[in-house]
Design a protein with these regions (language model features):
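Flavin-dependent oxidoreductase catalytic cores
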Residues: 1-312
């Protein structure tokens, strides 16, 4: 799988589900990842966990991201994922949420290189699919290169590097100089990630760091246009921002996709956060938000969107 020159959607737990990923594909994202999936849950054949692996053909190239620490469990989970035929398998080495790290998962694996190697090799040796890793810079910024080289030596095909240390969550600035240094010291493709808020920043950071590709996460929330905008900026030196009409229309299509035209009531709750993201900054949006947060009626939601569009 060639990731050079490509833009990917970062995996975000509870957000980048199959519906959002498909919307991003409409606007040119090159490849996507599943949400964070527990290897332990796959090992136990948890139905809830396996639901997170669902994807559609239009999302390809698509990777399933897992987290875990036990080599045997990771190997078992990987063999089960092989049957689902994703395009690649990704190992999460970047999640710094306390409850994840406390159990030794995510960025906690970056503390002990021996355990890290065992975990990565267990996945690589259990599949013919490309294996990637999404990593942070470790617990010390100077360890980033060493970690990346370990992953390369273990047979990882490419890495996505978030430019923060494991303890910083999203505080401070993403260190793209360290990402650049990693790129200069490994032979596998490196994808840069962190603090890309605008197409201009995406292009600037991409060019300055010399990474092979970029990954966009939080900046895509309510703004799937950003992938097309980056590509337009590269190709034409300019891009267009969506009008209110376009924002409402894509949100409407997102609702239809996620709720199956209102049949999947449970997904109406999930869509509330997307409503807020898509329409952030719209005039008089507060009263519409209050209505959206109260209703589970699909027809009413469509009527609210129509009113927002007309009032714009």
């Amino acid at each position: 799988m060639d990731v050079r020159g490509k833009i990917s959607l970062a995996p975000l737990a509870g957000i980048t589900d199959t519906y959002f990923r498909r919307v991003c594909k409409w606007f040119g994202v090159d490849f996507t990842y599943s949400e964070l999936i527990s290897a332990d849950g796959l090992y136990r054949n948890s139905k809830k966990t396996f639901l997170l692996t669902n994807f559609s053909e239009e999302e390809r190239p698509f990777g399933i991201q897992i987290f875990g620490k036990d080599p045997e469990i990771l190997s078992n989970a990987t063999m089960k994922l092989n049957e689902l035929l994703p395009d690649f398998i990704d190992i999460n080495l970047g999640c710094s949420v306390k409850k994840v790290v406390k159990q030794g998962y995510g960025s906690a694996l970056l503390k002990d290189f021996r355990n890290l190697k065992d975990a990565i090799i267990s996945v690589v040796s259990s599949t013919r699919l490309p294996v990637s890793c999404k990593m942070r810079l470790g617990y010390n910024v100077d360890k980033g290169v060493k970690i990346a080289q370990i992953l390369q030596d273990c047979g990882v095909s490419f890495i996505a590097v978030h430019g923060r240390v494991a303890t910083s969550l999203f505080s401070g600035k993403s260190d793209w100089e360290s990402i650049k240094k990693i790129k200069e010291n490994v032979n596998i493709p490196v994808i840069g990630n962190g603090d890309i808020k605008t197409p201009e920043e995406a292009l600037s950071l991409w060019e300055e760091s010399k990474v092979d590709g970029i990954m966009i996460g939080r900046a895509s929330l309510g703004n799937p246009w950003i992938f097309k905008q980056v590509k337009d900026l590269i190709k034409n030196g300019k891009y267009e921002k969506p009008t209110l009409e376009e924002r409402v229309n894509v949100l409407r299509q997102h609702y239809k996709l996620a709720t199956d035209d209102g049949k999947k009531k449970e997904n109406i709750y999930i869509m509330r956060k997307h409503f807020h993201w898509y329409l952030k900054g719209v005039k008089n949006i507060k009263m519409f938000k209050e209505r959206i947060n109260r209703t589970t009626d699909y027809s009413e939601i469509m009527e609210i969107l129509d009113r927002i569009e007309k009032n714009g």
